[in-house]
């Protein structure tokens, strides 16, 4: 019930759901995308045009342009580029001259690439799977922690119920002694001061009983709320007296911890993110260039069918460059900062990994002695019972 209804479990489900859709979005970026584009426009205006003799003249334009195109794009993670394949058709209607014409682009192949730039797709392919694996392990860990929290609330209530039983017994015992004291006082065998002391003991035990009952009610409310039980019911927990006899091997526990604990995935993610920041700082510091190349076929005609006959080839190549000449050390400083942060992360991860191993060993050691501690407590309880009977 707690794994389904507790606040921690509900929050963990929402967090994992968000991580899942982030993972789906990352996977979708690796797949081809298909896009339909269309930009119809109506132009009724007076515009200036340049004639063959170089003079300008205002002419009235009354035209409608309607186009549609299909485009497939695919990201290339290895290079960080993008390849595209598209086709389209455009119709132009000149209402003034009552002329219609078509322009077709049966096929166009293009490629876009940042040269010497930061390849975020490559780093995402390394980091995102680890982030998703970390999210899955975190969700499982949270559910296990919910079980542990529920167990703690269970035994808190069990302890409070035992304390209430002891408080009831102590009150009954103190009340009995006080009644006997009243009888003895009436016959003059004890002093008034002795009787008043026993009455004070009774009142103290009565207060202890009230406090124990309040504590039980509080723990019932805490457990009921954590389990998602809205009904106002009384819970009575019955702990099991049997103790499983087994020990945990330190090496096996260490191996399972490295396999299943989300902290290990977080260590690797943080390391890769620090290296990614260094690579990005280096790429943004120096020479940058962007290449775009497009090759395809195109044709135009006043008839739709004829616009697809004997298409002509078309090419478009653009190259943009950016060369920092003087930045007063800004780029170099950013690289130094990124490297310093990376080295800091390395140091932190080394220490946290060592602490992780020591913590696992400590928890295993503490767990393995629990059975012995419970056995000693049980023996102590039996001895106290025998002493009380005597």
Indicate where each model-derived feature is located.
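Small/polar, glycine/serine/threonine/aspartate-rich low-complexity segments that form flexible
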Residues: 38-109, 237-247, 279, 292-323
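Active-site lining segments that contact anionic ligands and/or coordinate catalytic metals
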Residues: 286-290, 314-316, 362-364, 371
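Bacterial Sec-pathway N-terminal export signals of envelope proteins
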Residues: 1-67, 114-116, 120-123, 127-129, ...
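Generic alpha-helical secondary structure signal
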Residues: 106, 176, 248-252, 316, ...
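Amphipathic alpha-helical coiled-coil segments
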Residues: 11-26, 142, 146-168, 178, ...
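Periplasmic alpha-helical coiled-coil/stalk elements that build and connect Gram-negative outer-membrane
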Residues: 126-256, 366, 370
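A glycine-/polar-enriched beta->alpha junction
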Residues: 4-8, 17-33, 69-101, 109-127, ...
């Amino acid at each position: 019930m707690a794994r389904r209804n507790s606040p921690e479990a509900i929050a963990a489900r929402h967090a994992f759901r968000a991580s899942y859709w982030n993972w789906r979005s990352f996977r979708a970026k690796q797949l081809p995308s298909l896009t339909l584009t269309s930009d119809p426009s109506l132009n009724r205006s007076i515009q200036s045009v340049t004639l063959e003799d170089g003079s300008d003249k205002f002419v009235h334009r009354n035209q409608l342009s309607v186009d549609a195109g299909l485009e497939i794009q695919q990201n290339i993670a290895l290079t960080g580029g993008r390849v595209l394949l598209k086709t389209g058709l455009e119709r132009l209607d000149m209402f003034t001259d009552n002329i219609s014409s078509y322009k077709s682009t049966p096929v166009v192949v293009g490629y876009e690439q940042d040269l010497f730039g930061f390849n975020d797709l490559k780093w995402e392919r390394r980091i995102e799977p680890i982030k998703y694996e970390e999210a899955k392990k975190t969700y499982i860990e949270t559910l296990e922690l919910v079980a542990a929290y529920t167990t703690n609330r269970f035994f808190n209530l069990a302890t409070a119920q035992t304390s209430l039983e002891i408080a009831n017994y102590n009150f009954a015992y103190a009340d009995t002694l006080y009644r006997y004291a009243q009888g003895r006082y009436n016959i003059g065998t004890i002093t008034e001061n002795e009787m008043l002391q026993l009455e004070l003991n009774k009142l103290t035990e009565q207060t202890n009983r009230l406090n124990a009952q309040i504590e039980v009610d509080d723990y019932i409310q805490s457990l009921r709320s954590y389990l998602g039980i809205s009904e106002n019911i009384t819970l009575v927990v019955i702990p099991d007296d049997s103790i499983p006899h087994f020990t945990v091997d330190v090496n096996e526990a260490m191996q399972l911890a490295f396999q299943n604990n989300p902290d290990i995935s977080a260590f690797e993610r943080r390391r890769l993110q620090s290296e990614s920041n260094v690579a990005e700082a280096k790429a943004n510091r120096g020479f940058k260039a962007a290449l775009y190349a497009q090759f395809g076929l195109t044709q135009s005609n006043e008839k739709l069918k004829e616009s697809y006959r004997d298409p002509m080839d078309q090419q478009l190549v653009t190259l943009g460059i950016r060369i920092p000449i003087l930045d007063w050390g800004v780029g170099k400083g950013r690289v130094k900062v990124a490297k310093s942060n990376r080295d800091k992360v390395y140091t932190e991860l080394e220490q946290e990994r060592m602490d992780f191993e020591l913590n696992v060993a400590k928890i295993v050691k503490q767990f393995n002695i629990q059975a012995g501690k419970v056995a000693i407590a049980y023996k102590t309880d039996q001895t106290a019972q025998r002493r009380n009977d005597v």
